[in-house]
Amino acid sequence: MRFICRDLGFDTGFNYKETDNYEAKLKELCPNGIDIYFDNVGGPITDAVMRLINTRARIAVCGQISQYNSDQPDVGPRWFGQLIIRQAKVEGFLVHQFADHYDEARRQLSTWLREKRLKYREDVVEGLENAPQAFIGMLSGDNIGKRLVKVTERTYSARPGSVGEEVTVG
């Protein structure tokens, strides 16, 4: 929690592995309810959130990782009634829908990175031979930040036309 509160500026948060009563924890942390929810998890956490949404809440659904490897995926949303009562808006979110903005986004994000306005953490695992365990660990949540596998050191050749060199053809 220190990382998300101190480094990223969130007011609060919780580790889903440290409680089995998500609704109680969310009520404690969000006593006035939830206005905005970015859902890439699905399952019991989303069920708990939906019981606490405020009137005209907005929900972006990007993924359902809790369901990806399930032998018996959840049967439909049990919270449609809440959406109606709370007049909430749910919209699917795919990054590809913004493909025509990629160049502009890359420029802006690069600027923000240089200015240190965007914060991130990388969790680097050394060696391709460790990739399978790194992937499994990522799916089980044993990392903080972006999980990367470092395959090799990057080296450059002194030959003209090699990676990293600019060649002018006259």
PLM feature segments, named:
Residues 1-170:
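Terminal helix/beta-alpha structural elements that buttress the NAD(P)+-binding lobe
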